[in-house]
Amino acid sequence: MSGAESYRHITVLLNEAVDALAVREDGVYVDGTFGRGGHSRLILSRLGDAGRLIVFDKDPQAIAVAEELARSDKRVGVVHGGFASFQTALDGLGIGKVDGALFDLGISSPQIDDGSRGFSFRFDAPLDMRMDTTRGMSAAEWIAVASEQDLHEVIKNYGEERFSRQIVRAIVAQRAESPIDTTRKLAQIVAQNVRTRERGQDPATRTFQAIRIFINRELEEVGAVLPQVMCRLKEGGRLAVIAFHSLEDRIVKQFVKKYSQHEPLPSWAAVREADLPEPPLKIVGRALKPGEAEIAANPRARSAVLRVAERTAGPIPE
């Protein structure tokens, strides 16, 4: 078993997310977060010979799995990079409109469970946290140079951590003496400065989440890709997004809401809402969460939320 496959990953909302795409046999689809290919393989099983699937991932280990799949299935195209490059990547592959796009946001189980990646406080390892280990600044490098204000804003805003001030003061004091370059060092600093404990949650959870989100620009990428997908979806094409925490889910929810309804017209407007063109998106069903059986089999699925939207014939506002 290769290193890329040695950590088990259970795909969350597998059938629900792929069902939401309403896969057409000859369609062109995008899996913006390939991971270990759970969603991608199910999409491929529903595509005919003329169908096509483009997969994105930042993680070199995920890309190794994707490229192996592409060697055995010519319908698959692989993009090593973040999904914020959605339109540029499709242009490079000669692809115009697509029939659907799926995004399973956040961190994958193999990334968490591979202690050497530095995502988890459960292991003592170099403090890295990069999804793409071939580029960018590691968490340890950023912590070494970030201002106290930047540290505070990241931990407070991305981790929603009540004790961010205390944690940051301790980080600044510690790094003046020695580098904070391992997961254990950071976790110990946090634990010493979080005064109350949330049931079933390690005190380092929020701080690690915050730094990971910042290092990988996760929220910025979500905000950047959604309008690109809307522009590239064919009429009737579907967007399906699985989010795992409130910050990213809020971005998705607000985007879909904004483009699935009209702005309220002022009372003096000469035009009626009924005369306006339909909005470019329509919401498909309600937000879907995993059932009890899935959560029992995979506790990490507990916080997942699936939202789905469909492209209409309506124009995209400028």
Swiss-Prot record:
GO BP, sorted A to Z: rRNA base methylation
Alphabetical UniProt keywords: Cytoplasm, Methyltransferase, rRNA processing, S-adenosyl-L-methionine, Transferase
Catalytic activity: cytidine(1402) in 16S rRNA + S-adenosyl-L-methionine = N(4)-methylcytidine(1402) in 16S rRNA + S-adenosyl-L-homocysteine + H(+)
Localization (cell): Cytoplasm
Gene3D superfamilies (alphabetical): Putative methyltransferase TM0872, insert domain, Vaccinia Virus protein VP39
EC number: 2.1.1.199
Binding of S-adenosyl-L-methionine, residues: 37-39, 57, 83, 104, 111
Keyword Nuclease assigned: no
Family under the similarity heading: Belongs to the methyltransferase superfamily. RsmH family.
Record's protein name: Ribosomal RNA small subunit methyltransferase H
Organism name: Neisseria gonorrhoeae (strain NCCP11945)
Species lineage: Bacteria, Pseudomonadati, Pseudomonadota, Betaproteobacteria, Neisseriales
Gene this chain is encoded by: rsmH
